[in-house]
């Protein structure tokens, strides 16, 4: 079974999970290829929900294409659930997220939700976070000072570069990747994150950091994880 099949399988399982919610709720929706599978699976049932709150411009575009109502987060007080993928997840439900660059908005929407439903395949499960590079969104003018502070953690820090042209942000390959918020991303490789809550707090206190892609405070409550045998539901 390939990665695309595993993503579709867990997307279908997430659809079934959120359809247990009472009708008329507002749903938080994440960003990335696995979240896209969830959106596509949920599309025939869009009328079950009063609306959605999106974590990125790309997700908003996909939701609108399917006919979902997308609401401004400032107009929503709370959400019953937020559904999103992860780049890594440990046994406690702490995650590394932000491989797609939407970490700040993802964390904002996750903080509004009563439960975080993480969807991924079993390759994302790790005993200790850090094999996947940890993203940190920053204000561009703070690149130097933040890099120096992050290097004290012991990993290798690199500036994320754009992979493709993005005209709306004047972004071309080999130039810094620009987030939906206009920030840059520093990726830290080679960390072993034994205390995610501590590292999350430490990095977030560095001047110039918008947020770090550690989801320790806003950890997953339910994990839907796909493998060759099916989808496991784990309460964290």
UniProtKB/Swiss-Prot annotation:
The active site is at residue 106. Substrate binds at residues 31-34, 84-87, 97-100, 124. One of its GO terms (molecular function) is ribose-5-phosphate isomerase activity. Keywords: Isomerase. GO terms for biological process: D-ribose metabolic process; pentose-phosphate shunt, non-oxidative branch. InterPro entries: NagB/RpiA_transferase-like, Ribose5P_isomerase_typA_subgr, Ribose5P_isomerase_type_A. GO terms for cellular component: cytosol. Signal peptide: none annotated. Pathway: Carbohydrate degradation; pentose phosphate pathway; D-ribose 5-phosphate from D-ribulose 5-phosphate (non-oxidative stage): step 1/1. It catalyses: aldehydo-D-ribose 5-phosphate = D-ribulose 5-phosphate. SUPFAM superfamilies: D-ribose-5-phosphate isomerase (RpiA), lid domain (SSF75445), NagB/RpiA/CoA transferase-like (SSF100950). The keyword RNA-binding does not apply. The keyword Isomerase applies. Its EC number is 5.3.1.6. It comes from the Bacteria. Homodimer. Belongs to the ribose 5-phosphate isomerase family. Catalyzes the reversible conversion of ribose-5-phosphate to ribulose 5-phosphate. This is Ribose-5-phosphate isomerase A. It comes from Polynucleobacter asymbioticus (strain DSM 18221 / CIP 109841 / QLW-P1DMWA-1) (Polynucleobacter necessarius subsp. asymbioticus). The gene is rpiA.
């Amino acid at each position: 079974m390939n990665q695309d099949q595993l993503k579709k399988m867990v997307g279908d399982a997430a659809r079934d999970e959120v359809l247990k919610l009472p009708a008329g709720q507002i749903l938080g929706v994440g960003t990335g290829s696995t979240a896209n599978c969830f959106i596509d699976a949920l599309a025939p049932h869009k009328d079950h929900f009063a609306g959605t709150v999106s974590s990125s411009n790309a997700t908003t575009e996909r939701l609108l294409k399917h006919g979902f109502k997308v609401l401004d987060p400032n107009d929503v007080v709370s959400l019953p659930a937020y559904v999103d993928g992860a780049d890594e997840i440990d046994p406690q439900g702490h995650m590394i997220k932000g491989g797609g660059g939407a970490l700040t908005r993802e964390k904002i929407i996750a903080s509004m939700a009563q439960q975080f439903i993480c969807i991924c395949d079993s390759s994302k499960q790790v005993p200790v976070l850090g094999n996947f590079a940890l993203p940190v969104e920053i204000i561009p003018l703070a690149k130097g000072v933040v890099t120096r502070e992050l290097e004290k953690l012991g990993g290798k820090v690199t500036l994320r570069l754009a992979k493709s042209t993005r005209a709306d942000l004047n972004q071309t390959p080999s130039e810094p990747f620009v987030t939906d918020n206009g920030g840059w991303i520093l990726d830290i490789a080679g960390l072993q994150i034994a205390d995610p809550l501590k590292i999350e707090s430490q990095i977030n206190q560095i001047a110039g950091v918008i947020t770090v892609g550690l989801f320790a405070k806003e950890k997953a409550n339910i994990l839907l994880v796909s493998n060759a045998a099916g989808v496991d539901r784990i309460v964290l």
